[in-house]
């Protein structure tokens, strides 16, 4: 059995998967905000409960936001303060007496989708998250590509390309990102960015679902806004695809529920790619909230 943990700032979610990659059981508990011992105990108790339920010593994989293992072996995860700065993988491996694997939660999302029955035919899968921020991951032949610093797939911190400024205007505001840089694309392409763009052009503060509802009703402003957003997304994604050249792009996050993105994006990409480039298949993520647990569990399928 494969145990996958999706750990965030508010919850620890465990999913248990069998050899056919089917979800057999899941449970969620609150993430301890303080106290490393309490955090370790919460994870170990869930593992013990799963072991007892299935009468097996399952493998353990964990997806967590941040850098799973820094140079000194500690975790960096600002959203999980109880464990940040601690040697989480080593401590859990010792307590559970088994190999524990950690990876970035965005990599786990991409890995979950790459192991979907429909998508295993594709050697190089790119996961793209359009949610509160913009992120993602790359999976090659069923294995996540992490890079030396676990920042492979941090697409949101690429800067606006010159074609974006040609589209939006060279006086377009370069917003300061939380990372400290100017013009990171997640400030324009995330759910927050989608809403900010609308307010920037129409001086009306609306949230993404409200704008999408207006678009569905045929509102002219919302229609123009979506056209502009999709063109900007195509410009930025074109740069990424020129570097990565994936077979498949799977889009997750809140904006993935907006069908115009997955249905209209492919037609906008060719003019932003090399003439010989093939537009990859673009699909909406299949596994929703279970994706983080699935991908974490499948870290043990990558041997």
Swiss-Prot record:
GO terms for biological process: N-acetylglucosamine metabolic process; peptidoglycan turnover. PROSITE patterns: ROK (PS01125). PANTHER family: N-ACETYL-D-GLUCOSAMINE KINASE, ROK (REPRESSOR, ORF, KINASE) FAMILY. GO terms for molecular function: ATP binding; N-acetylglucosamine kinase activity; zinc ion binding. Catalyzes the phosphorylation of N-acetyl-D-glucosamine (GlcNAc) derived from cell-wall degradation, yielding GlcNAc-6-P. Its EC number is 2.7.1.59. ATP binds at residues 4-11, 133-140. Pathway: Cell wall biogenesis; peptidoglycan recycling. Belongs to the ROK (NagC/XylR) family. NagK subfamily. Pfam families: ROK. The keyword NADP does not apply. Zn(2+) binds at residues 157, 177, 179, 184. Keywords: ATP-binding, Carbohydrate metabolism, Kinase, Metal-binding, Nucleotide-binding, Transferase, Zinc. It comes from the Bacteria. The gene is nagK. This is N-acetyl-D-glucosamine kinase. InterPro entries: ATPase_NBD (IPR043129), N-acetyl-D-glucosamine_kinase (IPR023505), ROK (IPR000600), ROK_cs (IPR049874). Gene3D superfamilies: 3.30.420.40. The keyword Transport does not apply.
């Amino acid at each position: 059995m494969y145990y996958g943990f999706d750990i965030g700032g508010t919850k620890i979610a465990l999913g248990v998967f069998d050899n056919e990659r089917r979800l057999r059981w899941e449970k969620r508990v609150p993430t301890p905000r303080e106290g490393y011992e309490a955090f370790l105990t919460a994870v170990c108790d869930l593992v013990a409960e799963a072991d007892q339920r299935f009468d097996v010593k399952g493998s353990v994989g964990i997806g967590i936001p941040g850098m799973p293992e820094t140079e000194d072996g500690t975790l960096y995860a600002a959203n999980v303060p109880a464990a940040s700065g601690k040697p989480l993988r080593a401590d859990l491996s010792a307590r559970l007496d088994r190999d524990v694997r950690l990876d970035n939660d965005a990599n786990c999302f991409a890995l979950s989708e790459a192991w979907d029955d429909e998508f295993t035919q594709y050697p190089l899968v790119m996961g793209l998250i359009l949610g509160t921020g913009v992120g993602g991951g790359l999976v090659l032949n069923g294995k996540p590509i992490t890079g030396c610093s676990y920042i492979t797939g941090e697409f949101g911190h690429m800067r606006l390309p010159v074609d974006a400024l040609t589209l939006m205007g060279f006086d377009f505001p370069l917003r300061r990102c939380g990372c400290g840089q100017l013009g990171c694309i997640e400030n324009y392409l995330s759910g927050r960015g989608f809403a900010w763009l609308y307010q920037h052009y129409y001086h009306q503060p609306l949230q993404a679902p409200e704008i999408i509802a207006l678009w569905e009703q045929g509102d002219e402003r919302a229609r123009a806004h979506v056209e502009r957003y999709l063109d900007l997304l195509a410009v930025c994604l074109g740069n990424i695809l020129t570097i990565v050249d994936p077979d498949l792009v799977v889009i997750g996050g809140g904006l993935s529920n907006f069908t115009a993105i997955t249905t209209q994006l492919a037609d906008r990409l060719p003019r932003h790619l090399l003439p010989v480039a093939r537009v990859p298949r673009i699909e909406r993520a299949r596994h929703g909230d279970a994706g983080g647990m699935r991908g974490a569990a499948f870290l043990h399928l990558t041997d």
